[in-house]
Regions:
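A short beta-strand element within the Helicase C-terminal
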Residues: 4-10
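Conserved nucleotide-sensing/catalytic segment adjacent to the nucleotide-binding pocket
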Residues: 1
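Contiguous ligand/interfacial binding patches
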Residues: 26-40
């Protein structure tokens, strides 16, 4: 392979991918299954695609010149790779809190129901 002069890593959060699956705006990688059941698309992404792509992403992390955030449709944001890595370094060296969410669709969520 020929390496380019600049590496732009385009990123989309898994939550946004799930939302686009639901709206039939996104298919699984190279499959063209826009109209397939959302749960099947999500499980394929969760168990196959995201595992493979996470490994690939690790090799690109130190090399990327820019990170392109594609989470807001038609409104991408871009930051220099060095600035992104510096922000991550700062984030992991101070307390932070993740915001939990519950998505009942994929794994059932029956235990949350009041019987």
């Amino acid at each position: 392979l020929i390496e380019g002069d600049i590496l732009v890593y385009a990123d989309m959060a898994r939550w946004e991918i799930q939302q686009r699956f639901r709206r039939k705006e996104l298919d699984n990688w190279g499959v063209g299954n826009f109209d397939e059941d959302v749960l099947k698309k999500y499980k394929r992404a969760f168990f196959i695609e995201w595992r493979v792509l996470d490994r690939h992403k690790k090799g690109l992390f130190e090399k990327m010149d820019y990170l392109l955030d594609t989470n807001i449709k038609n409104d991408p944001k871009m930051v220099k790779g060095d600035a992104f890595r510096a922000a991550l370094t700062q984030a992991v060296n101070q307390p932070f809190r993740l915001v939990p969410f519950f998505d009942p669709g994929v794994w059932g969520g029956q235990w949350k129901k009041v019987v």
